[in-house]
Regions:
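Short beta-strand boundary microenvironments
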Residues: 98-146
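A hydrophobic alpha-helix feature that marks transmembrane segments and, especially
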Residues: 22-26, 296-305
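A short amphipathic helical element positioned immediately N-terminal to and/or at the very start
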Residues: 1-2
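Hydrophobic, regular-secondary-structure patches
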Residues: 22, 26-100, 107-110, 124, ...
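Mechanotransmission and gating elements of multispan inner-membrane complexes involved in transport
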Residues: 160-161, 169-296
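Short, strongly hydrophobic transmembrane alpha-helices
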Residues: 7-31
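Beta-strand-rich non-transmembrane domains
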Residues: 92-97, 118-129, 152-175
């Protein structure tokens, strides 16, 4: 008798699970669709290097790990020079303690309607503003520090992690911005190794630092200290190498001045010769959701069988 009761209870549980699973899956998909589409619809255009449009959109909107092919600041300058849209460059390549570091400009905060809940906004290179969830999970507040994670911890010759000063915490926005660490573009370029600060060689008398020293030129060796923290004391020593127009980014938002300008801007990227693409995030995410719903229909059919 006891065995029959257990068998009956197990059968009822299985039937209940089978009946509930499609409903639970539908609720999950509906919530995911709302979250994905709301952010995509609010973002008019994304510009990036040709490749996977989905990778470009997912990294730019949701800061996922899959980094698209990189573009350059020259591509951003072309958008600005067109006078058809406001470019908002984004460099979302690096992480800090598992959260994406998003290098951008102050226009991003205005565009997303992000507000500071505690502390202040970005003002200097090396500063960071944290999304609400990041601050809560890592238990950080203005005045604390957050160190960037190396791309490859086993690369001993790689770029040193940067110790960033936390200066502000964003109010909760219920979006992927809550899960991001925001910094100035120059900060992310320093993390990438395009800029650095070091001891003043002209004032330093330590002979062990020099490979060669003449009246005109100074060549330092590996003993020269590279700063991994930016402060008021060493801020002036930080400088960048190379052509700024060739500095790399993961993408740029493009906010048209009006619908007609948006159409004209898209037309400039139709040519097959250009290495840059411009996409409408809503179209890309809608295509992704259609594929997901097709898979869901297959699962429903299997459950029914």
């Amino acid at each position: 008798v006891c065995f029959n009761k257990i068998k009956t209870a197990t059968l009822i549980a299985c039937i209940t699970l089978i009946a509930f699973l499609p409903l639970a899956l539908q609720l999950l998909l509906d919530e995911s669709e709302q979250q994905l589409m709301s952010r995509a619809v609010s973002t008019p255009l994304i510009v990036g290097t040709k490749g996977s449009a989905l990778d470009l959109v997912m990294n730019t909107l949701y800061f996922v790990d899959e980094v698209p092919e990189l573009m350059t600041m020259a591509d951003v300058d072309r958008i600005e020079d067109s006078h058809l849209a406001l470019p908002i460059p984004i460099h979302a390549k690096f992480q800090a303690r598992g959260y994406p570091i998003v290098g951008t400009t102050m226009d991003y905060f205005d565009f997303r309607g992000l507000a500071i809940a505690n502390g202040r906004s970005l003002a200097l290179v090396g500063e960071a503003v944290l999304g609400a969830t990041v601050a809560n999970e890592l238990e950080l507040k203005p005045g604390d520090f957050l160190v960037s994670s190396p791309e490859n911890p086993f690369d001993l010759a790689g770029v040193y992690p940067l110790k960033m000063h936390v200066v502000g915490i964003l109010a909760k926005s219920h979006s992927s911005d809550d899960l991001a660490v925001f910094a100035d573009l120059k900060t992310t370029w320093i993390i990438e190794g395009l800029g650095h600060g070091h001891q003043d060689l002209l004032k330093n008398q330590d002979a062990s630092l020099f490979l060669d020293r003449t009246k005109k030129d100074i060549t330092a060796n590996a003993k020269l200290r590279l700063y991994t923290e930016i402060s008021e004391i060493n801020l002036d020593s930080f400088h960048f190498h190379g052509d700024r127009s060739q500095y790399r980014l993961t993408a740029s938002l493009a906010v048209p001045t009006d619908p007609k300008s948006g159409t004209l801007l898209r037309g400039r990227y139709v040519s097959q010769e250009t290495l840059i693409q411009i996409v409408q995030p809503a179209e890309v995410i809608d295509g992704l959701l259609q594929n997901i719903f097709q898979i869901k229909n297959v699962i429903d059919a299997i459950i029914v069988l």
